[in-house]
Amino acid sequence: LPARMLNTIYINIFSTLVALAITIPLGIYCAVHKRSKSDNAVQVLSIVGYSIPVYIIALLFIWLFAVTLKLLPVFGMQTPGNNFTGFRAFLDKVYYMTLPVLVMTVGSLGGMTRYVRAAMIEALSMDYIRTARAKGLREKVVIYSHAWRNALLPVITVLIGWFISIFSGSLIIEQ
């Protein structure tokens, strides 16, 4: 694969993994604590985050992290003129991938959090959940062993389409 395509794949895979690591626990928490203040706050932030186009998030993050704070590079995938090897090359690549991965992750949090929450709320309202609670199972067992397993199927279905569509967004972010 060409280097640019490989970079796109790395950015998309890492941003998807980071987004899932955030959205799954957040969506489960919001579903379990439905209509609480924290759920309402997350829902408002999710809608706002979902409404902002990814290129606007990219411009804001470039301005904040690269221009104002000077923490991250604006372009490139490695330090110019240096041929690092081993772990140092890996750290250099991670440093240059941080801003695009951060933008792609933040751009995907809103929609996925809302979808995980909706799937979990639907699963938690099923009869088998009521039966599991009536049997005296611990709430963690009910949530993770019963509800999450059944909410996972629609989440995976949407995740596949979302992962494919994220490639089109990464073309804009990488420019």
Q: How would you name each of these model-derived features?
A:
Residues 45-76, 103-109:
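Membrane-water interface segments at the C-terminal ends of transmembrane alpha-helices
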Residues 1, 69-91:
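Hydrophobic alpha-helical transmembrane segments of membrane transport/permease proteins
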Residues 5-38, 54, 84-175:
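Alpha-helical transmembrane segments of integral membrane proteins
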Residues 39-43:
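Membrane-interface helix-entry/capping residues at the boundaries of transmembrane alpha-helices
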Residues 1, 57-58, 73-75, 132, ...:
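Short, hydrophobic secondary-structure boundary micro-motifs
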Residues 59-63, 76-80, 95, 163-165:
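Juxtamembrane/interface motifs at transmembrane-helix termini
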